[in-house]
């Protein structure tokens, strides 16, 4: 199986890190979740509905849609908060990345553990910029909102390609494909990891600073 890989890059102010990453992760999982499966008998099941809600960001001029699941939201907040703290405490130039990996389990014979086979990985590269004053922060609030909107459109376009998804499992195999631990939604099995890098600034960071400078010059 070939694992698809998608990379998104965002440049934000420190206080925008959490909201920007959550907006991207929630958007991806909105398209990679189903309602709970209700099996009647082997091979026959119904799928519950997935509720959604709009989320307004505090530090970014942006609203996104997420699955209406407090359990899923808590799990994502925990992972992103750990990344944000690690980024802040790293002493580096404020550059890191978060990876969201979707996988399915392949049963192995005893005494070996199950094999986790990734089928899609999303990487969000995050560059933190330092701003001089409140005027620059307000401009960044708007510009980051515009850029996030472009990322969301890109995510939706990728989701609409109808590429590989794990086939719907039988009742006995559902835990090999979906996370069934949540009571109100059923995302594909996933895991989130992060990495802090020591690299110097990227073209995205430079572009954001140029956008702010050009806006101030108007």
From Swiss-Prot:
GO terms for biological process: autophagy. The keyword Transit peptide does not apply. InterPro entries: ATG101. The keyword Nucleotide-binding does not apply. Signal peptide: none annotated. Pfam families: ATG101. It is found in: Cytoplasm; Preautophagosomal structure. GO terms for cellular component: phagophore assembly site. Keywords: Autophagy, Cytoplasm. Autophagy factor required for autophagosome formation. Belongs to the ATG101 family. This is Autophagy-related protein 101. It comes from Xenopus tropicalis.
């Amino acid at each position: 199986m070939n694992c698809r890989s998608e990379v998104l890059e965002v440049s934000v102010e420190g206080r925008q890190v959490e909201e920007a990453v959550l907006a991207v992760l929630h958007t991806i999982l909105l398209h990679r979740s189903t309602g709970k499966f209700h099996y009647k008998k082997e091979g026959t099941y119904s799928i519950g509905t997935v509720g959604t809600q709009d989320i307004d960001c505090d530090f970014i001029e942006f609203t996104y849609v997420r699955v209406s699941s407090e359990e899923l939201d808590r799990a994502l907040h925990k992972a992103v908060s750990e990344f944000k703290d690690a980024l802040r405490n790293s002493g580096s130039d404020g550059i890191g990345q978060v990876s969201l990996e979707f996988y399915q389990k392949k049963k192995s014979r005893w005494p070996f553990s199950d094999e986790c086979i990734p089928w899609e990985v999303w990487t969000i590269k995050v560059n933190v910029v330092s701003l001089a004053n409140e005027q620059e922060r307000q401009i960044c609030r708007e510009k980051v909102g515009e850029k996030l909107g472009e990322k969301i459109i890109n995510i939706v376009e990728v989701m609409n390609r109808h590429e590989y998804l794990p086939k719907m499992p039988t009742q006995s195999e559902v835990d090999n494909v979906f996370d069934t631990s949540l009571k109100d939604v059923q995302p594909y099995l996933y895991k989130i990891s992060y990495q802090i890098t020591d690299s110097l600034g990227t073209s995205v960071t430079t572009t954001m600073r140029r956008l702010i400078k050009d806006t101030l010059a108007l």
